[in-house]
């Protein structure tokens, strides 16, 4: 059920967390600020018409996400995730894809880690305690469901006006044949199988995108090949120190300007969010296979169904978390302070890195070090519906090799929907650039990225 802030205040109880001293430990060194070369303003080609329908994500610039996922940059290792997952005084528990060791950066990881954190909290508490969860994404929803099923009183706080976090479905039957998915919705076959029984049986709620094609300025060309990346990573893992994936490729003699290699790296970035120029070669991002599965339907509504009996406060950003060995106090963005015995924090890594939530006292040094060491990944999605198809290929996954396209991966949903719908995927540093564009420039960049697939004028009619 949904509740107002007034209801929360009435039920908050008289207890409050005592006076807390700021931690006197040194701060971890922040990652150096990266600079990017300004991108020329995109120009849309005439051969690619303006879309009749347009939607896109901007997770990289969203203050409640600051990214789409997480990955390990060169010089870090998976133990950073384990450090961040450690409870603090058995009062604060962290959960989400960034703290999962087995499937980090994925929806499966978010679900599994929510279960881990919920079980840890249940073990540390009794059924008289008041519990809260910060963040109503997949991890927050799953944790809330588990705590409620265990007989606990739990309140779920979400900064946005809707639940789902970085899962975002737009249900609009008048504009789209299926709900556009702006967040996490693409899964490998293994992840799809893993989610069955964990979250929902997705067998009848997914599309199998399993035919791929690669195009350059001359037309269709050879498909992508992940072998050069795998070979470079294998050699890099035998070296004395870690290196970024692109550095490992260069050391192995690869030409980073090769269009086919650039397309392969863009495909990896679009599916993992990892920037190849920063990602670890010792613990590299997974190179996706030739196919993926796309989850369809209103995922927001499905997550909402899991919250029956849970108090949910949307449009309630948590600005400050004060804690000691007696409990936790949450201060909302409007100034209200609410007291709880224990809290699970599922805020995205990017929010923690940008200090979107103040902790008092500061988190332990190991937690702050882990937050600084991990990297936020970026994935943006652009949905485009056209009045009629301007392309000839029937493949469902398109790759762009060569040229200066900002979006190098496209999904063709026309074979499934019967309508000319394309979905652009962009990851890593290019996703950051795309998120920062105005709507006009983002649309132009998307159209320009499709130029290779447009049928030549003399082939039309």
Residue locations for each model-derived region?
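FAD-dinucleotide binding site
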Residues: 1-461
């Amino acid at each position: 059920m949904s509740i107002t802030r007034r209801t929360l205040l009435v039920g908050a109880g008289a207890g409050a967390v005592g006076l807390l001293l700021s931690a006197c430990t040194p701060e971890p060194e922040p990652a150096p600020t990266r600079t990017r070369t300004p991108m020329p303003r995109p120009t849309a080609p005439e051969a690619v018409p303006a879309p009749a329908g347009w939607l896109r994500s901007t997770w990289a610039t969203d203050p409640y996400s600051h990214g789409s996922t997480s990955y390990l940059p060169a010089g870090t290792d998976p133990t950073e995730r384990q450090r961040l997952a450690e409870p603090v005084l058995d009062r604060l528990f962290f959960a989400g894809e960034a703290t999962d060791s087995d499937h980090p950066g994925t929806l499966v990881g978010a679900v599994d880690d929510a279960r881990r954190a919920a079980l840890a909290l249940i073990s540390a508490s009794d059924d008289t305690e008041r519990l809260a969860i910060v963040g109503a994404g997949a991890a927050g929803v799953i944790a809330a469901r588990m705590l409620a099923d265990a007989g606990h009183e739990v309140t779920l706080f979400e900064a946005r006006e809707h639940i789902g976090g970085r899962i975002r479905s737009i249900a609009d039957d008048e504009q789209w044949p299926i709900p556009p998915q702006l967040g996490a919705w693409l899964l490998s076959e293994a992840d799809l199988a893993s989610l069955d029984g964990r979250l929902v049986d997705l067998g009848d709620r997914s599309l199998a995108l399993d035919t791929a094609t690669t195009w350059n300025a001359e037309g269709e060309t050879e498909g992508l090949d992940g072998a050069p990346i795998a070979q470079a990573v294998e050699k890099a893992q035998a070296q004395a120190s870690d290196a970024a994936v692109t550095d490992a490729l260069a050391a192995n003699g690869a030409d980073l300007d090769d269009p086919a290699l650039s397309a392969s790296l863009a495909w990896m970035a679009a599916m993992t969010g990892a920037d190849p120029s920063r990602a670890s070669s010792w613990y590299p991002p997974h190179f996706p296979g030739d196919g993926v599965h796309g989850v369809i339907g209103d995922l927001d509504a499905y997550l909402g169904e899991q919250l029956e009996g849970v108090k949910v406060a949307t449009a309630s950003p948590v600005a400050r978390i004060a804690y000691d060995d007696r409990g936790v106090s949450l201060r909302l963005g409007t100034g209200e302070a609410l007291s709880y015995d224990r809290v699970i924090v599922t805020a995205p890594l990017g929010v923690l890195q940008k200090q979107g939530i103040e902790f008092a006292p500061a988190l332990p040094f190991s937690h702050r070090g882990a937050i600084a060491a991990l990297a936020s990944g970026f994935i943006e999605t652009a949905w485009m519906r056209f009045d009629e198809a301007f392309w000839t290929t029937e493949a469902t996954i398109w790759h762009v090799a060569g040229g200066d396209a900002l979006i190098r991966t496209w999904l063709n949903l026309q074979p499934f929907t019967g309508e000319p719908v394309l979905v652009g995927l962009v990851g890593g540093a290019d996703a950051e650039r795309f998120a920062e564009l105005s709507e006009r420039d983002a649309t132009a960049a998307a159209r320009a990225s499709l130029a290779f697939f447009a049928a030549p004028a003399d082939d039309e009619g």
